[in-house]
Amino acid sequence: MFLLGRLVPVREALRLLPVPRVHPGFGEPGALLDRGLWDLESGLERDGIADGLRLRPEDVRAIQEFAFATPCFAAADPSRPVRVPRDLVSGPPAGAGGALVADYRDGIGTCPEIARLWSDPLLLTIASRYLRRPAVLKRSRLWWTFSGTQADAADLSTFSVDHFHYDLDDWLCLKFFFYITDVDAEAGPHAFIRGSQARRRLSHQLTLFKGQSEKSLSAFYPPGDFLLLTGPAGYGFAEDPFGFHTGTTPTRRNRLILEVEYGITKRRVAGPYGSPR
């Protein structure tokens, strides 16, 4: 997969199976639709990304309370626990040492509202139909990105901030993101290049580097394909992480975001983050 998984034709061939009929069970729903399911799935197939998902307000509040009450880890380092106070709007918390991000790692499964999403019938339906196979939970993350830090190039690359890249976590993957705080242009919105999961310059497929400069990408993709996703707390979207994407640096307000990732194998995802047990 390390080599072949980078090639668009290989990944597209894996999705030649017909869209399956999915019976995800009767788990308690946590995600809601703000648009028709067919419309969301059509946009996802075409663009590699689609919004129109949201969390219930009471679930957003519960996840926020969990985040304020639970230690997270500066720079995703388990030896650097910190707490984020509820009144902290911008900048890293005390003890974070100016870290750009703080990740909750393995402990998020103790939050019932998060754990419920892992078997959410709507998310499993969308993921299984997009992946053309029963979706397998790969990873789930909850993390802060802080404004007002002086992150160097190494940190930006490590934590995928202002650094367009694609993920290679499985032969096929689908991620769901939910903003747990309000995210506008000044709070580090997620960025995605529309259609880049299926349309890619050959040189971007043959290199061993998953990251590409914005200059290189702008020479191939038109400006209108560079999307910034903003929305209130609870706003959600589905994304094929093989498309080029990045977080952006918050300039005025911190961002708390939840990710749920599905794939097609049980291969564990490498990286400095926790995974569901």
Please report, for each region that a protein language model flagged, where it lies by residue:
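Short, structured patches in soluble enzyme cores that scaffold and shape functional sites
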Residues: 141-144, 166, 178-182, 194
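Active-site rim elements
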Residues: 111-116, 220-225, 247
